[in-house]
Regions:
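Short, small-residue-biased leader/transition segments that mark boundaries at the very start
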Residues: 1-5
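Noncatalytic, helix-rich "gating/capping" subdomain that lines the substrate-entry/channel surface
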Residues: 6, 10-147
């Protein structure tokens, strides 16, 4: 859709956009951003359309007491359960659709056709979330108490890594295909900590390399955010950085894709400027 702004013609992309628990109409400068916002808004509308199912799951979703205890430092269990439900609505109903519904009737018929598996999706995601939080909680304990100064560089790198893997809202923010890999990433951190006393120097070299790669990613991500861009190649690079960490610190766990510094560099060349 063309619009004139200050005598300049520009193309804008209409989409629904989430606003609290409701949605409104919005316009975006790129189709990727419009698609992303529209999809999140549809999750919210599905929560309203399938209100009975959502209410049932809020009260019956297994493991909520334990989830609440493990998530306590990050937020309220109610928020976590909402995120699990929204992400489950996405994976159960919206995932795999070539085009997303643009009207209420289209969304209603899609929901009716695919809602049968919602409980299964939500229970599976709750279990994955519990596994992730147990591993995360175990790692948090390692930072309490006296820290060996020789290991400080590695521990700072790990803390920073963890803050970008597990944070308030991570269940909904992390793409489903990568969320299921989080337990492996966290186990690789455990292995790194176990080996650390015997390879402090080696670890320091890797930490420096990873810090450079991450800074490069963050700078580009910030630039894209400012421009309203969403680049799938940059997102892929971000998760390949986690795979690269596994290849350095937890080789026995294996990687989802063959990975090396050369492959990372090649992927970076595909990222939008």
């Amino acid at each position: 859709r063309q619009m004139c702004i200050r005598d300049r013609s520009m193309t804008v992309y209409p989409a629904l956009v989430e606003e609290g628990n409701t949605v409104k109409e919005g316009r975006f400068s790129t189709p990727a951003e419009a698609e992303y916002q529209h999809r999140r808004a549809l999750q919210r509308l599905l929560m309203q359309q399938l209100a009975e199912s959502a209410k049932f799951l809020r009260s019956k979703l297994p493991g909520q007491t334990e989830l609440g205890l493990l998530y306590r430092e990050l937020g309220r269990v109610e928020s976590l359960v909402e995120d699990i439900l929204l992400a489950s609505l996405d994976s159960c109903i919206l995932e795999g659709e070539a085009t997303l519904p643009r009207d209420g009737a289209g969304l209603a018929s899609l929901a009716e056709r695919k809602r049968g598996a919602l409980t299964e999706h939500a229970e599976k995601l709750a279990k994955l979330t519990l596994d992730i939080l147990k591993l995360w909680h175990g790692l948090q304990k390692r930072f309490k108490g006296k820290i060996d100064l020789a290991q400080a560089v590695a521990l700072n790198d790990i803390k920073q890594q963890l803050s970008h893997l597990v944070y308030p809202g991570f269940v909904r923010e992390t793409p489903a295909q990568w969320l299921k890999e989080l337990p492996r990433y966290l186990k690789a951190i455990e292995m790194r900590l176990e080996k650390l006393p015997g390879q402090v120097q080696k670890d320091r070299v890797w930490s420096a390399e990873l810090a450079g790669l991450w800074a490069q990613y963050q700078a580009r991500a910030a630039k894209h955010a400012q421009e309203g861009k969403r680049d799938p190649q940059l997102e892929l690079y971000r998760w390949w950085l986690e795979e690269y960490r596994v290849s350095l610190f937890g080789q026995q766990l294996g990687t989802k894709v063959p990975i090396s510094d050369k492959r990372l560099s090649k992927q970076w060349s595909l990222v939008d400027a």
